[in-house]
């Protein structure tokens, strides 16, 4: 089954370097017509709530960290990892095995290809893939330049 509302992985450090857990007192909000797959984990917020909006579909074995917001009608596919405080816009497709670093903002109508690593914000209507989340159109142009010298 899925695990909904677990404490996020938030730590600070004592002066001697000992890690201490930061309490998570937020909750999660799940909209209407949401599907959440097996072995998925959605962490509750640290102070504010983690939010999954209406019509979101989350596949099996997805991890969504504390304070995230997943916009309406977005799809999150197997093994995707969304780090803390990420905001995903509406109508997005987050591909399998993709990872999004904390505090990134993903615009509306964004497609993130499988295995992508996203380390910065993405504007609306982009198709992104690759190790550093390259815009798909830019990647195709670069490939053509390399192959054909154009």
For every predicted segment, state its role.
Residues 2-135:
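Structural signal for interior beta-strand "rungs" in well-ordered beta-sheet cores
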Residues 140-150:
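Long, leucine- and charge-enriched amphipathic alpha-helices
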């Amino acid at each position: 089954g899925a695990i909904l509302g677990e404490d996020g992985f938030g730590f600070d450090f004592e002066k001697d370097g000992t890690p201490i857990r930061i309490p998570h007192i937020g909750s999660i909000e799940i909209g209407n017509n949401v599907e959440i797959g097996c072995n998925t984990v959605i962490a509750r917020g640290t102070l504010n709530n983690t939010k999954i909006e209406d019509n979101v579909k989350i596949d099996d074995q997805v991890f969504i960290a504390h304070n995230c917001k997943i916009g309406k009608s977005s799809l999150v596919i197997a093994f995707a990892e969304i780090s803390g405080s990420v905001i995903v816009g509406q109508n997005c497709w987050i591909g399998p095995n993709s990872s999004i670093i904390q505090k990134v903002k993903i615009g509306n109508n964004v497609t993130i290809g499988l295995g992508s690593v996203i380390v910065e914000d993405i504007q609306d209507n982009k198709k992104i893939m690759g190790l550093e989340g390259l815009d798909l159109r830019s990647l195709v142009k670069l490939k053509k330049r390399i192959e054909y010298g154009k």
